[in-house]
Amino acid sequence: MADSAVHVEGLVKRFGTTTALAGVDLDVQEATVFGLLGPNGAGKTTLVRVLATLLAPDAGRAEVFGRDVVHDAAGVRELLGLTGQFAAVDEILTGRENLQMFGRLFDLSAGDARRRANELLERFDLADAADRPARTYSGGMRRRLDLASSLLTRPRVLFLDEPTTGLDPRSRNEIWSVVRELVREGTTLLLTTQYLEEADQLAEQIAVIDHGRVIAQGTGSELKDRVGGQILEVELVRAAERDNARAALAGIGCGEPEPGERLDQLTLPAPRDGLEMIEDAASALRRAEIAVSDLGLRRPTLDDVFLQLTGAPPSENGAVGDAVTGNGQPGPTSASVSVARAPATLRPASTPPSRRRRLSPRKLRADITDARVVSVRNLLHFVRQPDLLVFSTIQPIMFVLLFTYVFGGAISQSLPRGVSYIDYLLPGILVQSVTFRASMTAIGLADDLKLGVIDRFRSMPMARSAVLVGRTAADLVRNVLIIVLMIIVGYIIGFGFKAGVAQAIGCIALVSGFGLALSWIFAFVALTVRSAEAAQSAGFVVLFPLVFASSVFVPISSMPSWLQTFARVSPVTLTANAARSLALVPGTPPSLGGAIAWIVGLLAVFIPLSVWRYRRMT
């Protein structure tokens, strides 16, 4: 353990009644590649997420270079890089902007981030595409960009979770070359894979994991030797004769014939000297009148190892299939293979004291930088997505024009004397605009969760609150810009502030503050439902009646009495009335205290709730 880069002891993780990790023990030596092999659902990704501090284990202990992943998670994040199953890059940003952003979040200066980004773009053969949006990249290019994002600070340990799944052979070989180069430079790699050839090519040590526990471990050669002898491989002319061939070959060699990777193949364990067995097999097949296209000996592969350990062959695409027997348990294993038995009663490992990280001036500056970097990234999304830009700007302007020129004449009769409908409407439309756009906070966060960008942020040594602060701050800036644009349109069609510059600024500040409070509500919604569609539906169900059952478009005196009771205490009504008074009437609005109370109350409740929910994602 003294020279271990990663040490795992009795690690357990459960999701409800499902045990994803059932007492995993591992030691990964420094500057080596450790391969973790297993089928889908075996527990590989869960183990990586625990080691990357994205999940908290239920029992056991895991350390990265001596730092506990639970009690010194921030320290662990300073040492690692993570590349998940999917390329967690920002598709709206260019390749260069992605690397510069992640570099800044890794606490590099702006200049160092630019220089390091340029180095990695050259190294990963992405320089020519550096200024193209990442969404235009091929799968292999995205993977290389994702891997480059993990190497901005030259991490001591790199977790690669199925880095080549879904890639073509050329792209896969490019990733393999990068992995070998990293090891030569001294980086430790923990590689999970479904591809047996990949583990054989890259890993110095391999562990086979199934149903949440390690069932065998050793070098590739050691695992193959444990299978024993050689393999007699039979390739039939007609796949339909495979069952007849199995019957004909029964009793030949030192084991029963087993299906191969293809429907026209059979394999048999052979003794060390298998030449005589070839003759016996050929004779048996001739007697059964079964045509053979190929018959020969080969050394065992990891495919054979996996077959013997789990009782299931790899799938036809070369990936490991689900390795379970009929009773849902790991398949039979050879007596010569070291197999991990079900662990005894597992107890939580001894817990070292948590390391408290004090908020120094330097740390505070770094946290502010993190939030600013995330804010800029989100503002670039707003600018570079035309559909989002058009919806956010045109929709509220259309409301102003529609209500002013279509409904204004009828509604004007219920307004106080001397107040034009455009003067009444515009402050309300400002409130309506920030209210409807609050759901965009949830949609943006939910998309980042789905694409793995949030996991990338959470695995980095950045401020834990920066993702949420950066998102809501960007939405605040966006709201202010759209409010100003709508006021300009309002002035064109007859609106005007009547109470002076100070109150006009107060009106804008009040509406913006209300939008910020709603953004924090929807940040909490996104972290709870984790679905853009669900977040959008929740926004429609809640916000639509809240806006239309308020004084945004009409005075509440024109509403039925039962609805007036709700409308008078609605935060939308109080904010709209206060904004309207600030815009039109000198002095302190009567509803200003109620509006501010709603804003402060919502922020006081949902900022802590959102931060708590974000931290509870482990």
Regions found by a protein language model. Give the residues of each.
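Junction motif at the cytosolic side of a transmembrane helix
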Residues: 337, 342, 346-351, 583-586, ...
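ABC-family P-loop ATPase nucleotide-binding domain
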Residues: 1-12, 312-368
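Aromatic- and glycine-rich beta-strand/loop motifs that create alpha-glucan
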Residues: 4, 355-395
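Membrane-interfacial helix-loop-helix junctions in multi-pass membrane proteins
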Residues: 412, 498, 547-602
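Hydrophobic alpha-helical transmembrane segments of multi-pass membrane transport/permease proteins
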Residues: 384-410, 422-437, 544-546, 601
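ABC transporter nucleotide-binding domains
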Residues: 3-210, 216, 458-459, 464-473, ...
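ABC transporter nucleotide-binding domain
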Residues: 176-271
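Alpha-helical transmembrane segments and their short interhelical loops
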Residues: 464-539, 544, 589-611
